[in-house]
Amino acid sequence: MSSLPFLKMPFLKMHGLGNDFVVLDARAIALDLTLERRRVIADRRLGVGCDQLIVLEQPTDGEADVFMRIFNPDGSEAGACGNATRCVASVVMDERKTDQITVQTISGLLESHKAGMSPNGLPVISVDMGLARMDWREIPVREACDTNHMPVGLGPLQDPVGTNMGNPHATFFVDDLAAIPLAELGPQLEHHRFFPERANIGVVQPLGDRRLRLRVWERGAGLTLACGSGACAAIVAASRRGLVDRRAEVVVDGGTLTMEWLRDGHVLMTGGIAVAFKGELDASLLA
């Protein structure tokens, strides 16, 4: 396999409920994607623009069909992205003409399958996002604590639930989500010293009837229209607090995800995906 900065590189622009991705296929050619190049591609003014840059590589695990790497707009590598996993799974399932595949990430193997079509004709994809981890050392946080009531907060956001879904999440519960200035509080909490690896900051308003309203300040990405791993953390946190019984519709800015925290500890996420457009990256973009 050769390694090139590339002259022209095909890409897919995809999204899951508005959580958007640039998908590059490096299964046949190793891409020279430096930190700065990742940032340029993800920049909505200088490049294509996306919430995360996704790079497909050959799997290193014999049980996987594809290896997916995830990069934030700041160039840092992420351990998990549920909506990106569903997008990638749809692409590879169509390639292989199958209804289920296994996606390898740096956090582990994720099984995904087709779950029908949405009312507007978009593919609906389910992914098992793996085990929800709740020990304070696994999230991680700086000091031993009950992760169902973590001693950290800022202003109206207090007493969060900690969850690791391949990346760290702090989920806060409020009565009025619209009143929370998440663009202001999110980055401060993301970088709070309590979280040695930073954290994704989710804010949930319970709506009743097994429905949760969610917004997430994503680590390394900021506010997005949807956050799959944040929705996973939300269903786990709400279940631990007794607000729902392990299953709920999670309403994000871009739509609705169906979430279930299974009895074996895994979290299942289901929702629609779409291909927005196809294009080519030119080498001049990354000069």
Question: Which sequence ranges carry the predicted segments?
Answer:
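Internal active-site segments that recognize and position negatively charged phosphoryl groups
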Residues: N148-A179
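Membrane helix-loop-helix hairpins that form the core translocation module of multi-pass transporters
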Residues: S107, V124-A132
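Short, conserved active-site entrance elements at the starts or edges of catalytic domains
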Residues: P140-H149, P187, H191-F195
